[in-house]
């Protein structure tokens, strides 16, 4: 609008050089398992830092997993992205991320991982982590930062009290992204940027007679009004955008992980299926979907939640040099824990699994 194309060119050149430097640094720093560490090249940790803290209190995972979203440095299923997520998950506790190598829970930073799963199309894992994120919110949905010990009393340290403003912002934006988000084109290239609508749908939401909706939701492309109604054998999606000067390259609806697409009808001038998404030209207004339930994906959900808790490593305190001493986790099930049960993922199921595991761990300490 200002007509300063000279300034725009300068900023684009700077961004291109900066991205190139970051990619070179990642290639030089990535570990043998594909994990992208918390710093690039050689960086100081522990006593070498200005804070002089012990090693276990530094070098903490924070935003080093933001490799696919929103940065778009790598494709969501790139080895570095997936390996970094896998590496960080080993330090999870209570289904969320931790800080200081497992010493404390860290609620809201979990949203960073959820968004990587979201753009990778792994909506099941995104939902599991999301349900744990809100499980660790207060009665008015307030979030917290850290300073809460895993699998203990859940008392918040008064030096780090809730509610936490950034936790609220991250959670709100995450829920927004579950309804719609922009992706592609490395942010700047509008001609390669897509709009995803309802990209993460829970089995608990997709029941006959229920619906998801948004009214004048702000996006990079303007204001989006839409409604997704669930029917007996499918869904009906209506779409009424008020685009600005930009339109998305396409509008994409991801088929929920627990459904198998049978057919669809739309008034879009162009449409096709790609990467388990119905890809629609931005002129569409209606989409009718026929699908069927994939019941097998619901088998053993409760047992998987329990095994996930138990497979994570735990913080055993610092060693004699101040490094974190990690106690390896191991996935297992007790005799009364049936892995053959068919139970769709929902918040209540996650809460049930968490309470069971919490009681098991705390009762062993008495």
Predicted regions mapped to residue ranges:
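Inter-helical turn/loop segments and adjacent helix faces that build the functional surface
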Residues: 2-13
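Exposed alpha-helical structural elements
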Residues: 10, 21, 66, 79-84, ...
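Non-catalytic C-terminal accessory modules of carbohydrate-active enzymes
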Residues: 124-361
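Short, solvent-exposed mixed-charge patches
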Residues: 364-366
């Amino acid at each position: 609008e200002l007509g300063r194309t000279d300034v725009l060119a300068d900023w684009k050149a700077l961004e291109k050089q900066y991205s190139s430097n970051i990619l070179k640094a990642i290639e030089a720093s990535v570990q043998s398992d594909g994990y992208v560490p918390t710093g690039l090249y050689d960086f100081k940790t522990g006593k070498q830092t200005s804070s002089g803290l012990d090693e276990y209190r530094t070098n903490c995972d924070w935003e080093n997993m933001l490799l696919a979203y929103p940065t778009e440095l790598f494709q969501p299923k790139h080895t570095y992205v997936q390996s970094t997520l896998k590496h960080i998950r080993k330090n999870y506790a209570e289904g969320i991320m931790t800080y200081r190598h497992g010493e404390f829970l860290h609620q809201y930073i979990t949203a960073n991982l959820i968004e990587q799963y979201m753009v990778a199309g792994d909506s099941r894992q995104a939902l599991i982590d999301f349900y744990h994120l809100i499980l660790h919110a207060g009665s008015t949905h307030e979030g917290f930062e850290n300073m809460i010990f895993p699998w203990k009393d859940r008392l918040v340290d008064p030096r780090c009290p809730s509610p936490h403003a950034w936790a609220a912002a991250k959670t709100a934006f995450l829920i927004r992204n579950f309804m719609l988000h922009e992706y592609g084109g490395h942010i700047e290239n509008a001609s390669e940027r897509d709009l995803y609508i309802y990209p993460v749908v829970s089995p608990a939401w997709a029941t006959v007679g229920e619906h998801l909706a948004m009214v004048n939701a702000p996006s990079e492309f303007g204001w989006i009004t839409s409604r997704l109604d669930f029917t007996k054998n499918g869904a009906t999606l209506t779409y009424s955008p008020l685009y600005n000067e930009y339109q998305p390259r396409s509008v994409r609806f991801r088929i929920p992980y627990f459904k198998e697409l049978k057919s669809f009808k739309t008034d879009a001038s162009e449409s096709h299926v790609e990467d388990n998404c119905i890809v629609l030209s931005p002129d569409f207004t209606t989409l009718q979907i026929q699908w069927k339930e994939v019941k097998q994906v619901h088998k053993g959900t409760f047992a998987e939640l329990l095994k996930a808790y138990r497979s994570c490593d735990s913080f055993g305190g610092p060693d004699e040099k101040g490094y974190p001493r990690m106690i390896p986790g191991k996935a297992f099930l007790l005799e009364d824990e049936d892995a053959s049960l068919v139970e769709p993922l929902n918040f209540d199921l996650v809460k049930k699994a968490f309470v069971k595991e919490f009681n098991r761990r705390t009762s062993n300490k008495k």
